[in-house]
Design a protein with these regions (language model features):
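Amphipathic alpha-helical linker/stalk segments
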Residues: 72-100, 130-136, 140, 152
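Helix-turn-helix
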Residues: 21-25, 29, 33-67, 71
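N-terminal intrinsically disordered/low-complexity leader segments
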Residues: 1-21, 32, 211
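Hydrophobic alpha-helical connector segments
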Residues: 71, 85-115, 167-171
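Hydrophobic/aromatic-rich alpha-helical bundle segments in the mid-to-C-terminal region
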Residues: 116-117, 121, 128-136, 154-202, ...
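Short alpha-helical functional segments enriched in proximate histidine and acidic residues
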Residues: 33, 87, 108, 149, ...
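Short hydrophobic clusters on alpha-helical segments that form packing/core surfaces
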Residues: 26-34, 76, 80, 105
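Short coil/turn segments at alpha/beta junctions that flank glycine-rich nucleotide-binding fingerprints
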Residues: 36-40, 91, 112, 156-157
Length: 211
């Protein structure tokens, strides 16, 4: 299904001296343009026009559109990492920690669909592996925090099937699949999203973990 995407909104030109606008404003405009026009169609000029500054002013913040796209991903992964670290250190059962992390992941995706698509749906594959190295390291840290309690469950002999690593990958993949469908196919007659998330987590965790 092809989404009908709106053309990015063009802001009035900022008065001279306002070229130091917050990076967040640039990133928000860039998100919309990357989603609407794809990587090839997104240009520094279009992003600058959308926030009402000159291309020269935008280059004061970002050297190219690759850096913008990577920062969008880094910000998203960084937020999820902070959540995972917080949950990982809570004195509750490992299964409860896994559930909280996955709930937070899905809610983040659905509350920030543009950000999520750019960070987790292959948009950055056009960027060289060298440029993506720092982002990949951040992603590995985020996944390590998530998979930690799953390895605890495995070490305690509570997994019905698979290993800690395979269980972690399946849990992530399943939740990613749900939110990706909800984001990219919003016009389907979906059940309420909270119910879908609950059914997904109930089915996955009850199927993988013994009582």
């Amino acid at each position: 299904m092809t989404l009908a995407l709106k053309k990015p909104h063009k802001s009035a030109r900022k008065p001279k001296g306002d070229g130091h606008l917050r990076r967040g404003e640039i990133l928000a405009a860039a998100e919309r343009i990357f989603i609407a026009e794809g990587y090839a169609g997104a240009t520094i000029r279009k992003i600058a026009d959308a926030v009402g500054v000159s291309s020269t002013a935008l280059y004061m913040h970002f050297r190219d559109k690759d850096q913008i796209l990577l920062e969008i991903g880094d910000d998203a992964i960084g937020q999820l990492l902070a959540v995972n670290v917080d949950i990982a250190h809570r004195p509750i059962d490992a299964v409860a920690r896994v559930r909280l992390m996955l709930e937070a992941y899905m809610k983040f995706a659905l509350d920030n669909p543009n950000t999520y698509q750019l960070a987790f749906c292959g948009s950055r594959d056009v960027i060289s592996k060298e440029k993506q190295a720092a982002t990949a390291e951040l992603g590995d840290r985020c996944f390590a925090e998530f998979s930690g309690p799953i390895h605890e469950i495995a070490a305690a002999g509570r997994l019905r099937t698979g290993s800690g690593e395979s269980a972690a990958q399946v849990l992530w993949a399943a939740c990613h699949g749900l939110v990706a469908l909800l984001i990219t196919m919003p016009d389907r007659n979906w059940a309420p999203r909270e119910e879908l998330m609950k059914v997904t987590l109930d089915g996955l965790l009850h199927g993988l973990v013994t009582d």
